[in-house]
Amino acid sequence: MRYFIIFISLIISSFFILSLTNKLAAEEEWTIDKFRTLSFARVSGEQTHGDNLNFWITARDNCEKIYNTFTVYTYERPGDFKQLLNKNIPIKLNGVDITASVQDIAPFLMGYRVHLSLGSYPIKEYVYFLKEFYDEFQKYEIEIVDGIDFKAAKYFDITTNNWKLDKLVPSVLEASKLCKTINHLDS
């Protein structure tokens, strides 16, 4: 009987730990910080946690413009990877066809980390647009897709990721406030 109680206790404890781990993994964690003349808000991907969705704000732009970028990690290592630098590649954002500009490709761990840009925009208008966009779809999903003379699978082993943006507005507002302290200190 004693072993049975210990066995049941272990099973219940295991389920509790697993449910707690799943709850923690599902949390939307934002990093808000500053570096030199810029501040940023960043959230990790749900499919690939190391893929980040970034919102950069620079003091150089009087903290009024936001640069929206994302990173993708891939194990693929084609010999012509660097030819994608400064090129636009096709993506789908919640199913909508757009492009992203490849800003950087750097060796990372056993593959490459690719940094892509979605552009720069006035902060307030863009962040509220994104919030409405996210609220409408209840997701923010980017899929790298095939295009003219471009096969996504050649360069990316995982072509889709999504991010939670429930805390987008307060996170970017905090990053914007940080940017203004940089601007104030530099003037």
Can you say where each PLM-predicted feature lies in the sequence?
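A generic "folded-domain core" signal
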Residues: 23-187
